[in-house]
Amino acid sequence: AGILWAGFVLKPAPRLLYNPSVSAAIGWYIVEPLKVAKRGDLVASRLPGHAESLASTRGYLPAGVPVIKTVWAVAGDRVCVDAGVLTVAGQPPLPLLGQDRSGRPLPVWTQGCTSLRLGEILLISNETPESFDSRYFGPVSLSHVIGRAVFLGDISWHTPDEREASDW
């Protein structure tokens, strides 16, 4: 029984997350294990400490809440930031905003070009250019990635009376 329990603890069941942010489609996601992160994967991830602190302080996201973002670049990719634009070979250029919606300056994590190291990825929102993502806090360690995020939809809950009325 101890061995079975240990195996269960080491391989947790997929998680269910609700995303209320416009940085990814609003709704429910199941989070599945992810062995290798590839460009284009939608993932649930914790933010690096400095980014989590800033996001929490500014009210973007409570501390400890995961984000859902797209893997934009992986280890070995050359990432450049120049004149307020982030570029990665094979990806469309992304503008960097100078300030957030409240007029506060956004951080710039690098100037010039750098190559992502083994175990690093860039996480970007495909949904909104105003997302707080790797454009502002830089690479994320794969150890922060919880898993692949699979969109289930925005499930609405209705009382039996509402459901019957909406069926007509």
What are these regions (language model features)?
Residues G2, A6-W168:
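Soluble "head" domains of membrane/secretory-pathway proteins
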